[in-house]
Amino acid sequence: MPRSRFAELSRAELAILVPELLLIGQLIDRSGMAWCIASFGREEMLQIAIEEWAGCSPIYTRRMQKALHYEGDDIITIFKGLQFDIGAPPQFMDFRYTVHDRWHGEFHLDHCGALLDVEPMGPDYVKGMCHDIEDPTFDATAVATNARAQVRPIHRPPRLPADRQPHCAWTVIIDPSYPEAQPIPALAVIAKTIAANWELAPIDPDDDGVADYTGPLLSDVDFGAFSHAALVRIADEVCLQMHLLNLSFVLAVNKRAGDDTDLATSICTKALTGIAGVAAERIRRALALPADLDGLATVLRLHPLLNPAGYVVADIEPGRLSVQPSPAHDDGAWIALCGNSSPAALQAIATAVDPHLHVRITGTETDWTAEFERTEFALKESVEVQVTKVSRGAAFEFQSRRSLPLTAV
């Protein structure tokens, strides 16, 4: 089992990086859906989003439960899972939880970054996200824990009045009389991918710090309390969440594109390019990395495009990235959209570190080397990255918070 690339970071650095990775995962849709609207229209974009999340979230939810040893079938398990879900990154999607008992709970969002992103687009887009997408995808997430869980709105946008707080509120109830929620067909397809079944190193229980989430549900996760080993595992799991979301996105896009494989590849490459650049910028800024070839090498080692190690086989050094045929290629994951004929995503990463860094790729589509060189000519930020930065999440800043227990052990 290859050593995680995240293991090179200190515990303090990992505590900074993990919430960044969760937020980056949320921004994947900000990158991809604009191109889906342009090609298929708003209604099909909504269906792509539903299939994308419902096709993968039960898989990665169960993976994180197993990794942090909080597997169960109750409300507390559902809420813990949301705290490590790229669909609900901390603070940007500010979930506040209330547990009445094991089978009854509520949550509301004091701040919904996704809502603030779509409100300027008008009520149709708000309803599309907060009704059409949320209804099936909330239940899909809950079904990973208990198929008889139902997530239902108390109130939700469009907001009346326009400044209503909290942004939305929901009940979560598990009742044996409820019909079992049914998975969508895409879930069975994604469950067979290499990413879904990728094995990561177990967390060393003797490492200094918290090794699991077996204790009470916390109001806010204190990532700094986790051990180095736990944070490494969480970071790799979050990267797998992103790969699974993308694989589900690719499946949904291919379904609409049909025989037009060039269209599907174009949409998915644009989506990758946008999130690749934004992710690189956030990683560099969060860890205060230098804007040079050394900083770029570190960004590449930590970038979700190239993680977990082993799933993507790569050698990284200042000025050079070499990629070999990988399990991720077999899945058709992000790395399959990079290579000799497709430098856009790697250039977006380099530009985010320093606009003067230019990339040149040689080799085949699965076995290639990218060389980075600093020149006097500064490249402009790509349109794909600019589109992704329409989201407030691209510039969102995390705040320090106290972590308080909400439930007894």
Model features per residue range: what roles?
Residues 1-106, 113-133, 143, 149-155, ...:
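N-terminal accessory segment detector
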